Amino acid sequence: MGRLVEAIIASILLSLCFTITKSAPKSALITNLPGFNGTFPSKHYAGYVAIDKHRNKNLWYYFVESERNASVDPVVLWLNGGPGCSSMDGFVYEHGPFNFEPKKKNSHLLHLNPYSWSKVSNIIYLDSPVGVGFSYSNDNADYTTDDTKTASDTHTFLLEWFKMFPEFQSNPFFISGESYAGIYVPTLAAEVVKGHKNVTKPVINFKGYLVGNGVTDEVFDGNALVPFTHGMGLISDELYEETKLVCNGTYYTGGQSGVSKECAGKLKTVSDTVNLLNLYNILEPCYHGTSLSALDIEFLPKSLLTLGKTEKPMAVRKRMFGRAWPLGAVVRPGIVPSWSQLLAGFGVPCIDDTVATKWLNDPAVRKAVHAKEEKAIGNWELCSSNLEYRHDTGSMIEYHRNLTLSGFRALIFSGDHDMCVPYTGSEAWTKAMGYKVVDEWRPWMSNNQVAGFTQGYANNLTFLTIKGAGHTVPEYKPRESLDFYSRFLAGEKI
């Protein structure tokens, strides 16, 4: 009898494996990648999903099956910020299946990443909105978009994607992202929940979401810098106390009134004091190029000079750029200026994404990942110069409240050395939700070391810091990131 049961179980497991092989679109399967000579630890797929066939409007994705158990592990959508930056940024530089070793020639060597998030999850890297990365439309009007349209389009993508990959419809589904994805993630989550209420098919088995160093609310984000710079020892006690006094403890008000003249003066002093630091990780060196003319330097916004050029251990990342609201400014309603608009006519310091740019513009790579040729849709850019983007959804606080009160789990994580979207803002708004503290502030551990600190709230909300990390947390702390990511997805205590 026991052998019969074992045989039945084995047959079921075999049929599940066969289902995955059979159901996934064969045309999307990636069979090789230039630069990688080994065996993929799991299946990779890439291609386009038409979200509007009449307009030939298409979103491009790269899907990595879990290396553990694809049939039951969560499916996670990853979104980079910008707005308008490709999620292949996360694939190449943060938590994708490969580490990229740049070569002096045009080729790159790819090595397996021991801390890839595909170790424990199926993960979709999506170029969104249309006009970003390899995503495109035949109608240029589609390159004028906003938060609301982006959320709707991405929801349409998900519905179509799960039809293409029906074997994953029952898997737990999570949405994740960083920086301006602090807007993308909750607005998309709200669309998914709305789809549940409208009984939209297929039903997405949505369980929760993760946001890293995400822009959220203009007042909370705007008030984060001064306490961050003081807490990090970047400004003096005297300057902090003087600024706090003349500003009445409020450094950004939003709306039309603004702050007093005296407060504005002190805030400028704070800004000037930290001006030469690396905006995206204050521990990293900041490269100040010598190629700029005196005229360029005079007219460039000072904060541009804080865009850091860093040397990582793998020597892949040469700078930190384009992950957040331009220049690290507060997210305000209205049109978001693109980098190309801000920098028209000027030399740009500290910008070097040669690894991702060269690799993804290699015709052999584009063919391997089923992307359109350059002559059809143009070259791949880390952050698109094609978009006109409008922020139209306001504060994310109510989105988070509605989602968490509806039973969806939320992890708000912050690299504690990011000055672009400081952890102080995220800590403040999560506290201001008013939920009961159910897990008092404490250290969390990775590899038997303190990796940061966390505080848990009622209604499924967790705030987490990552010690020593900058704006793109998995890039700086890959092992620690995989640890908190794995625990959160599994519903375990971090």
Swiss-Prot record:
Subcellular location field: Secreted
GO-annotated biological processes: proteolysis
Active site per UniProt: S179, D418, H471
Annotated transmembrane regions: none
Residue positions the entry lists as glycosylated: N37, N69, N198, N248, N402, N460
Enzyme Commission number: 3.4.16.-
Any matching Pfam family: Peptidase_S10
Keyword ATP-binding part of the UniProt annotation: no
InterPro entries on file: AB_hydrolase_fold (IPR029058), Peptidase_S10 (IPR001563), Ser_caboxypep_his_AS (IPR033124), Ser_caboxypep_ser_AS (IPR018202)
Gene Ontology terms: cellular component: extracellular region
Disulfide bonds: C85-C383, C247-C263, C286-C350
PROSITE patterns: CARBOXYPEPT_SER_HIS, CARBOXYPEPT_SER_SER
EC category name: hydrolase
Protein's name in the database: Serine carboxypeptidase-like 21
Protein's job: Probable carboxypeptidase.
Family membership: Belongs to the peptidase S10 family.
Domain of life: Eukaryota
Keywords assigned: Carboxypeptidase, Disulfide bond, Glycoprotein, Hydrolase, Protease, Secreted, Signal
Signal peptide location: 1-23
Tissue: Expressed in flowers and siliques.
Gene Ontology MF terms in the entry: serine-type carboxypeptidase activity
Keyword Ribosomal protein: no
